[in-house]
């Protein structure tokens, strides 16, 4: 159900109608595989993917600029997340589809199902990456069969079947010194097949946003921005500081 603090179902229906009158579409953004510490119904020990060693769960965070390890909270516990075991993915996907089927939504925005693939290396019921891939593909198909449009972030090849939009598509190459030239191979393959865009322009750390915009146009990507209804300053001293420019 829609949280009462967010306006409930009626306000969601009103928002969808307002966006439709402007010619837009409303997508429900959902993360199935990266479960944050603030989740109330998640059983961490049972449902989190594990390493080979007993007691080690797949828990990550944001990149620490000092150590470059992607396990830091940087002072905000909501930055920490667990990787859901592929074993439990069908359970959560089916529950989500069942609970949202009656809402007036144009589609679903899959925050991590299109760019996150991982194994579960627990000693019993081990699930390797190939098995995880089959599970993810089956759930992507189930979401596509729901009749809603599908948007994915990142857009790995296995996630593109039945997808209408791709956001956060790669617009740059690696920063390795050995790389001489950048070729937009990803965009060359997708162009004309699905709509795609890169990172929101107003959240990119850059001293030349105009060049970033022109690069998107050159690569055939739609310019993208992220906006918030309230003052962005309300997100100061929070894990959402990456959205401070919205």
Predicted feature residues:
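Aromatic- and glycine-enriched glycan-recognition loops and surfaces
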Residues: 1-37, 41, 131-141
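Active-site-proximal substrate-binding groove within the catalytic cores of carbohydrate-active enzymes
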Residues: 32-40, 46-106, 112-246
């Amino acid at each position: 159900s829609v949280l009462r603090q967010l306006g409930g179902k009626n306000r969601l229906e009103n928002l969808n109608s307002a966006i439709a009158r402007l010619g837009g579409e409303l997508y429900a953004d959902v993360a199935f595989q990266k479960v944050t510490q603030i989740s109330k119904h998640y059983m961490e020990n049972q449902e989190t993917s594990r390493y080979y060693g007993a007691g080690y769960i797949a828990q990550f965070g944001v990149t620490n600029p000092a150590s470059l390890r992607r396990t830091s909270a940087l002072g905000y516990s909501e930055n920490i997340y667990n990787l859901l075991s592929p074993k439990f993915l069908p359970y959560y996907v089916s529950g989500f589809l069942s609970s949202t089927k009656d809402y007036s939504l144009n589609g679903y925005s899959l925050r991590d199902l299109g760019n996150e693939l991982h194994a579960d290396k627990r000693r019993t019921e081990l699930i390797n990456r190939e098995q995880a891939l089959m599970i993810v593909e089956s759930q992507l198909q189930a979401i596509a069969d729901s009749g809603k449009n599908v948007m994915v972030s990142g857009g790995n090849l296995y996630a593109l079947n039945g997808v209408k939009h791709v956001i956060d598509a790669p617009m740059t190459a690696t920063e390795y010194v050995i790389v001489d030239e950048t070729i937009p191979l990803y965009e060359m393959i997708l162009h004309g097949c699905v709509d795609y865009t890169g990172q929101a322009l107003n959240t990119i750390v850059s001293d030349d946003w105009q060049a970033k915009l022109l690069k998107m146009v050159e690569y055939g990507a739609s310019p993208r921005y992220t906006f918030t209804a309230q003052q962005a300053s309300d997100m100061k001293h929070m894990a959402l500081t990456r959205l401070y420019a919205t």
